[in-house]
A protein has these predicted regions:
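Structural signal for hydrophobic packing residues in well-ordered secondary-structure cores
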Residues: 27-34, 161-164, 168-171, 192, ...
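Acidic, metal/ion-coordinating pockets
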Residues: 1-250, 294-298, 304, 445, ...
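Feature captures C-terminal
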Residues: 17, 326-465
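A short C-terminal boundary segment appended to hydrolase-like catalytic domains
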Residues: 237-330, 462-464
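A broadly conserved detector of short glycine/acidic/proline-rich loop/turn motifs that flank catalytic sites
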Residues: 137-140, 222-224, 237, 319, ...
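Residues in well-ordered beta-strands of folded domains
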Residues: 104, 219, 316, 393-395, ...
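Amphipathic, soluble alpha/beta structural segments
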Residues: 116-132, 151-154, 176-179, 183, ...
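Glycine- and acidic
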Residues: 8-11, 285-288, 436-437
Length: 465
């Protein structure tokens, strides 16, 4: 007898609910169809469902996301870095308390005491006809952040090696839910032939028909749930083995919306708006925001960052603020709207030479006009860099490009060999936006505060009537 086993999955929604009601309708329909046919079917999420960029996620600290997943009927989920490092310890500890699905993450640990009751290292599920399926999941080890929040992520390869032998002995099939990224997924497939399926996320890769590496089929469905993934396994009960593994992703953006989900989203948005409608200050004058110009609010915010982190200098890009603020009542919702990024303050150590190179790079048209989506940045462009504690003099070339002619502190040039503590947005410590910052061997992150928390303090101190 041949038995088909079905998995449907989502990954990296990032609280982008544009297509969520379509996702809900598609998944509920698929599950109902398989239940009618008496076929085994599970719904999975691979992490980063929560992202505090959205007011619903911000107001409910992720709890509304769990309600939405319950409504769809998810069976299993794992933790992404956006759940893991953007929520305070207590909020994450209780995030899944009301989940009607099992949460699996074998390398996630609480360093402050007992583990959350919802946390499973592995899970075993069973098909209608008795095929035992072992589920293991891992999340990306951003311990520089996690440890500041009272969590620890153990090394992925060591964790897999620890649990995979046990699963191999007790189950027929092993499914790995990976919030590690495509490169890690491929390497894990090469190292661990025991894995049959790797369902991935984190790096927002889209594999339309899956990819076979060693013994595993690897799959992932991009980001924001424009696609939903499906894995179909065929088990031969006579031969007692898998004889076929298939993986597909389906574009759901053209499908009809599930009206019940639409109503729930509207209800949650109204409630979130009410919760965020808490007055922060009253402003007598409107606040001007410009991405490519020096503004008072960006200068004040950069000054606050310098003082708050006790750094010698500070730098922030003007693109962090997305919109103007009118005169009158300013709520936390307004602050979230103009500064929605899950970005934390950070202090790095740079030599005088390195800092000057960073400053020069920041004034290039290429960086200022860079369209960025990622590293926590949820805006449009990087914009002009604003400095505190430094005087940066620039001139314009005949071609219209601006260049840095002089950098001083209290009228004196920077010592090229001296190390300075520079406060900035943590997004510059990732990737290659500003290589000197990314390569700094000394990085101190501040959690759970976001830059918008410093913005609220700045507005209270400098702009309140």
């Amino acid at each position: 007898m041949l038995e088909k086993i079905y998995f449907y999955y989502t990954n990296d929604l990032h609280s982008d609910f544009e297509h969520w009601s379509r996702v809900a309708g598609y998944l509920k329909g698929a599950k109902a169809n398989h239940n009618t046919k008496n076929e085994s079917c599970w719904l999975l999420d691979i992490g980063d469902h929560v992202d505090r960029v959205h007011p619903i996620a911000e107001a409910f600290m992720g709890q509304a996301n769990i309600r939405l997943m319950n409504d769809v009927g998810y069976d299993l989920a794992t933790i992404g870095n956006n759940e893991g490092i953007t929520l305070a310890h207590e909020d994450l500890f209780h995030l899944y308390d009301k989940a009607n699905f099992q949460v699996v993450c074998a390398n996630f640990h609480n360093v402050q005491g007992k583990e959350p009751e919802w946390l499973n290292t592995t899970v075993t599920i069973q098909s209608i006809n008795g095929v035992k399926i072992g589920i293991i999941a891992l999340t990306a080890p951003f311990n520089a952040f996690y440890e500041l929040l009272g969590w620890y992520i153990s090394p992925p390869y060591n964790t897999l090696a620890r649990y995979i032998k046990e699963l191999e002995e007790s189950t027929d099939v092993i499914v790995f839910m990976s919030h590690l990224g495509i490169n890690e997924d491929q390497e894990i497939a090469r190292r661990f032939p025991q894995l049959d399926v790797i369902i991935g996320g984190h790096t927002h890769h889209l594999l339309r028909q899956g990819e076979i590496v060693n013994n595993a089929v690897i799959t992932a469905a991009g980001k924001h749930c424009a696609f939903v993934g499906e894995v179909i396994l065929t088990w031969d009960h006579s031969a007692q083995k898998l004889i076929k593994k298939e993986a597909y992703t389906t574009d759901i953006t053209h499908l009809e919306k599930d009206q019940q989900t639409e109503e729930t989203l509207h209800e949650l948005f109204v409630e979130a708006t009410t919760q965020l409608d808490q007055s922060v200050i009253e402003m007598k004058h409107p606040l001007d925001v410009q991405w490519f110009e020096h503004t008072e609010v960006m200068q004040r915010l950069t000054n606050t960052l310098k003082e708050w982190t006790n750094a010698e200098f500070a730098m922030l890009n003007a693109g962090l603020l997305l919109d103007h603020l009118p005169a009158g009542k300013v709520t936390y919702g307004d602050i979230h709207r103009i500064c929605p990024h899950p970005i934390n303050p950070c202090v790095v150590e740079l030599s005088g030479d390195e800092l000057v190179e960073v400053i020069r790079a920041s004034f290039t048209k290429e960086l200022m006009e860079l369209t960025l989506k990622g590293f926590g940045f949820r805006g449009e462009v990087i914009g002009r860099m604003i400095y505190s504690g430094l005087t940066v003099e620039t001139e314009f070339l005949s071609d219209g490009n601006e260049y840095v002619s002089k950098v001083t502190c209290n009228g004196e040039p920077l010592d090229p060999n001296k190390n300075y503590l520079v406060a900035t947005a943590d997004m510059f410590t990732f990737g290659r936006l500003l290589p000197e910052i990314a390569r700094s061997k000394t990085k101190k992150y501040f959690l759970p505060e976001f830059l918008r928390d410093l913005l609220a303090d700045t507005l209270r101190k400098s702009f309140s009537t």
